[in-house]
């Protein structure tokens, strides 16, 4: 026995003694050597476990420590949630509900995204963008604007434009799985009378269109012919689709109109507060037969449109087609 070794008596269960005996024989060493080795290893093992545990905690904390990317993404996410909660339908919307909507199993990780502790995957960010009507390029990479303004010209073919306004968007899975419930035609209260069209789905997703149309006399020949077509399109929508899709028209100040066009606000935060003003219904309709004065110059424009709408042969051919009611590109 070494001078440094200390002898002491240890009472152990008989079953444990038998296991030590068997292990000593298997390892070809004495019972004392076997017991000493196992005691020593148990302390080393505990030290190793502590080191591994420390590494796990360190990695966990590092993973949840804010980085510049996490901070930027969290700022965007909090902006999106803030804008969404300004809308009546979403004013009590929570991160947990958002996590459920995008098929997360729990809300724990989603809440960590908003605190800049974890970074969502690109796929998760794309789902959030779809469910909140946000521009994915902005949410993922900070490019463009938070809300996409689609600068488009109507095709000026009824079938195509009815599909554009009333049909679901086949290029977006979330939109394609929902139906359009409402269309808003918003005219700027200005001399030119620019136009924004909002296409609102049953799931409250929204698409924003900004066609180069002026609802006014501030038009060249081509622009005025496009305005006549626009009147034909809206008359068809009101005649055949209003029972399935709500069609509203509004007037909006220049300041608020331009704010929507910046793409920095959710359009419904402004549009849902507007009152319905039926200028779309009345612009190419001779009834009611009285001045309506929706804006300065409305009644003069209306009189001109009524005259030219009736004089355009191709418009009258379409509008008076006895089979027009059968030519619906959208089925509900």
Provide a role label for each language-model segment.
Residues 275-332:
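Charge-dense, extended regions
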Residues 29-50, 145-146:
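Short, basic amphipathic alpha-helical segments that act as recognition/interaction helices
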Residues 1-5, 52-101:
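A short, Lys/Arg-rich alpha-helix, primarily the initiator
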Residues 7, 101-120:
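Recognition helix of helix-turn-helix/homeodomain-like DNA-binding domains
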Residues 1-16, 21-29:
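Short Lys/Arg-rich basic patches
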Residues 39, 138-157:
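Short amphipathic recognition helices of helix-turn-helix/homeodomain-type DNA-binding modules
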Residues 162-295, 299:
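Long, charge-rich C-terminal accessory regions
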Residues 122-138:
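DNA major-groove recognition helix of helix-turn-helix/homeodomain DNA-binding modules
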